[in-house]
From Swiss-Prot:
GO terms for cellular component: cytoplasm; elongator holoenzyme complex; nucleus. Pathway: tRNA modification; 5-methoxycarbonylmethyl-2-thiouridine-tRNA biosynthesis. Keywords: Cytoplasm, Nucleus, tRNA processing. Belongs to the ELP6 family. It is found in: Cytoplasm; Nucleus. It comes from the Eukaryota. Disruption phenotype: Narrow leaves and reduced root growth that results from a decreased cell division rate. Higher resistance to oxidative stress mediated by methyl viologen (MV) that blocks electron transport during photosynthesis and by CsCl in light. Accumulates anthocyanins. This is Elongator complex protein 6. It comes from Arabidopsis thaliana. Its main location: cytoplasm. Component of the elongator complex which is required for multiple tRNA modifications, including mcm5U (5-methoxycarbonylmethyl uridine), mcm5s2U (5-methoxycarbonylmethyl-2-thiouridine), and ncm5U (5-carbamoylmethyl uridine). The elongator complex catalyzes formation of carboxymethyluridine in the wobble base at position 34 in tRNAs. Promotes organ development by modulating cell division rate. Involved in oxidative stress signaling. Prevents anthocyanins accumulation. InterPro entries: ELP6, P-loop_NTPase. GO terms for biological process: auxin polar transport; negative regulation of anthocyanin metabolic process; positive regulation of cell population proliferation; regulation of leaf development; response to oxidative stress; root morphogenesis; shoot system morphogenesis; tRNA wobble uridine modification. The gene is ELP6.
Length: 262
């Protein structure tokens, strides 16, 4: 096994040869987490992979949760300089912290705001495709905050946005990575867009606390459902479910199977 690959890489379909194109091209990756166990570190790891110096890939990042400085600080610890990638046009950062859609009596304004955001993403994809031969990834951190921004109208706007982005990923062979906080809907009926995200996702990554409770040297577990693992070049595919644990360090993540941490 290539020592640069970890258990998450392998679960996502990367192999020892680091095949080009990426196995995530044209796919939807959904990261689900909860209050007890944040899945943000998975997003950061995928950001680093997209912006690797060994590739020409580009990243469009929609930040509903944190300012640019937050991601830049974390990625620097992982050896990735977001400011440099931004100036080199490999990273296009949408600061969505101030986005607030209108109240329910102005539904047309909400529809226009969501449609405008998608058109900006679509145009950015076109511009990037004209200057790079690499894959383009669209990341959303996080979808639940977009849903909160449209509260007062209805979550259909989020569902529309999701379908827009899914169509874009299919037509332009882009990757779509979405972080969503699953447990905020625990006390209510799950909205349609949440069910649709799970349905559309080619890969579902779920970050959860340990079933056995807290541990000093293990911070949680990941369950990765990959719906599109190819079957040795035979033209068929199969679902692959993997479960492993992780430990978050200052400058990286350790992944290991239960009971196998050295």
């Amino acid at each position: 096994m290539d020592r640069s690959l970890n258990l998450l890489d392998l679960a996502l379909g990367f192999d020892e040869q680091l095949a080009i194109p990426s196995p995530l091209n044209g796919k939807v990756i959904l990261i689900e987490d909860c209050v007890e166990t944040s899945g943000s570190f998975v997003l950061h790891q995928l950001m680093k992979r997209v912006l690797s110096s060994n590739s020409s890939d580009a990243l469009i990042f929609l930040a509903f949760a944190r300012p640019f400085s937050h991601y830049d600080r974390i990625l620097r610890k992982l050896g990735c300089n977001l400011a440099t990638h931004k100036s080199n046009n490999r990273l296009v950062f949408f600061d969505m912290l101030m986005v607030k859609c209108s109240d329910g009596d102005q539904m047309e304004d909400n529809v226009s705001a969501v449609a405008k955001l998608f058109r900006e993403i679509q145009e950015t994809v076109r511009k990037l495709q004209s200057v790079t031969s690499g894959n383009i990834t669209v990341m959303v951190d996080d979808m639940s905050l977009l849903e909160i921004a449209t509260t007062g109208s209805n979550s259909d706007h989020v569902l529309d946005f999701l379908h827009y982005c899914h169509t874009l990923s299919s037509e332009s062979n882009c990757s779509l990575v979405i972080l969503n906080h699953e447990d905020i809907y625990a006390s209510m009926e799950r909205p349609a867009f949440l069910l649709q995200m799970v349905c559309l996702a080619d890969v579902v990554i779920k970050a959860e606390p340990l079933a056995s409770g807290l541990a000093n040297d293990v911070h949680g577990q990941l369950t990765v459902l990959n719906k599109g693992i190819s079957n040795s070049g035979r033209g068929s595919s199969r679902n692959k479910l993997q479960n492993f644990q992780f430990r978050i360090k200052e400058n990286g993540i350790d992944y290991f199977y239960p009971g196998c941490r050295s």
